[in-house]
A protein has these predicted regions:
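Basic, amphipathic "hinge/linker" alpha-helix immediately C-terminal to the N-terminal HTH DNA-binding motif
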Residues: 17, 69-90
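N-terminal helix-turn-helix DNA-binding core of bacterial DNA-binding proteins
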Residues: 7-48, 71
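Glycine-centered, phosphate/nucleic-acid-interacting loop/turn motifs that mediate DNA/RNA or nucleotide
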Residues: 61
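Amphipathic alpha-helical dimerization/coiled-coil segments
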Residues: 86-118
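Short beta-strand "wing" residues that participate in macromolecule-binding interfaces
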Residues: 65
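Residues within the DNA-recognition helix of helix-turn-helix
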Residues: 53
Length: 118
C-alpha cells in the first residue's frame, strides 16, 4: 500500500503494515528461517502471498535470503529487520491491552498455539 507522502510513519507503514507482514516478521523474530517454518507460524496465509511478502521484505532490506541450497533457502532478518523487534513487541502488548473483542471459536487454533510455545 502506498500513501504517496513523505512522512516517516507512512514510509514505515508501506513496508510493515501490509496484511500478514507483522506476523511474518514476528515469526522470524521467534527464530523461523525456513519457508515451511514461517508458513507454519502463519497457517492461514497462502504460500503465494508468503512468498510475495518475503520477496518484498527482501527488496526493502528487512530480510535476506541465504543458503547454499537454492531449493531450501533460509530467510534471515537483517539489521533493519531486527530493529522491528520492539515495534512488534509493543504491537503485541497493545493488542493484549486494547483489542478486547471477545474471542471467537475460529480465533482458536491449537496448532498455532503449540507452535508458538515452542
Amino acid at each position: 500500500m502506498r500513501y504517496g507522502q513523505f512522512c516517516p510513519i507512512a514510509k514505515a507503514a508501506e513496508i510493515v503494515a501490509e496484511r500478514w507482514t507483522p506476523l511474518v516478521v514476528a515469526e522470524m523474530l521467534a527464530g523461523s528461517v525456513h519457508f515451511s517454518d514461517i508458513r507454519r507460524g502463519v497457517p492461514l496465509m497462502s504460500q503465494t502471498l508468503l512468498s510475495k511478502r518475503l520477496k518484498e521484505l527482501e527488496r526493502v532490506g528487512v530480510v535476506e535470503r541465504r543458503g547454499a541450497n537454492p531449493r531450501r533457502p533460509e530467510w534471515h532478518l537483517t539489521q533493519a529487520g531486527h530493529a522491528l523487534a520492539p515495534v512488534i513487541q509493543h504491537l503485541g502488548e497493545w493488542g493484549l491491552c486494547h483489542a478486547q473483542d471477545p474471542i471467537q471459536d475460529d480465533d482458536l487454533d491449537v496448532t498455532i498455539l503449540t507452535w508458538n510455545i515452542r
